[in-house]
UniProtKB/Swiss-Prot annotation:
InterPro entries xref list: ABC_transp_permease
Chain segments annotated as coiled-coil in the UniProt record: none
Record protein name field: Galactose/methyl galactoside import permease protein MglC
Keyword Cell inner membrane included in the entry's annotation: yes
Amino acid sequence: MSALNKKSFLTWLKEGGIYVVLLVLLAIIIFQDPTFLSLLNLSNILTQSSVRIIIALGVAGLIVTQGTDLSAGRQVGLAAVVAATLLQSMENANKVFPEMATMPIALVILIVCAIGAVIGLVNGIIIAYLNVTPFITTLGTMIIVYGINSLYYDFVGASPISGFDSGFSTFAQGFVAMGSFRLSYITFYALIAVAFVWVLWNKTRFGKNIFAIGGNPEAAKVSGVNVALNLLMIYALSGVFYAFGGLLEAGRIGSATNNLGFMYELDAIAACVVGGVSFSGGVGTVFGVVTGVIIFTVINYGLTYIGVNPYWQYIIKGGIIIFAVALDSLKYARKK
């Protein structure tokens, strides 16, 4: 192989290698069971993707700034459990707080999003003002949030929280039927989140600032960007996205436990990297995040659909994450 051809191959591998791997996996799934492409399955994939898109949008903003968040999944779980306890039906014999009326959905959204914002602010303060790395900071808050959630879960009975108010069930499980295809309400909420983040990233000074910080924090600081404040804001915003995603996930599934959200952060990070959001910072698009989530959800759903052992699924997903990050590192090695 000539030097030129070798260089072209390496360039192609860096740019599209991960998509080839994912397409091969998808082809294997379809070959094993062609019914995978049914409208019902596509509807389910889109619904599952919608919640993951909301969560991944929160993580993506952090990766753009050369950060990450290992606590995302546990924040999703905390929001799910809190929302579930506040949105149970009054007719539910196992209602956690039997004397308390079911709260309006909008109020519960505000409550869980406020909790998420506070956790995000704590992460942001530690990272921006105490200069602790995002990995260590969010690893610590992941453990703390899970502990808080488990204590609350034990306090309210330590059993799956279900029996939601009909209004909340409709809010999270409702859909628009188009023949055999069902477009869920959750997909509409995800589209709103996507539009919001697209405007934030592309049309606001804040968006320009976070990309500048990700590209070169020192240069951003010299140019007048308040790096610490912007990091604080992006981490708080990420907490809001996790919280809203957790509320929707509880409603979509129909119940919540303290283990809901386990490993969600890894799926979100993997989807972001597959979608072109670079750990080098300063690179990423909303469309890429959405694409990455959908691809990863198709693979997850497909492997389960054809009966692949869950333990093998962990191995496959872990390999995809390592491969995607390795390609990302190669792609931006010269830039670094």
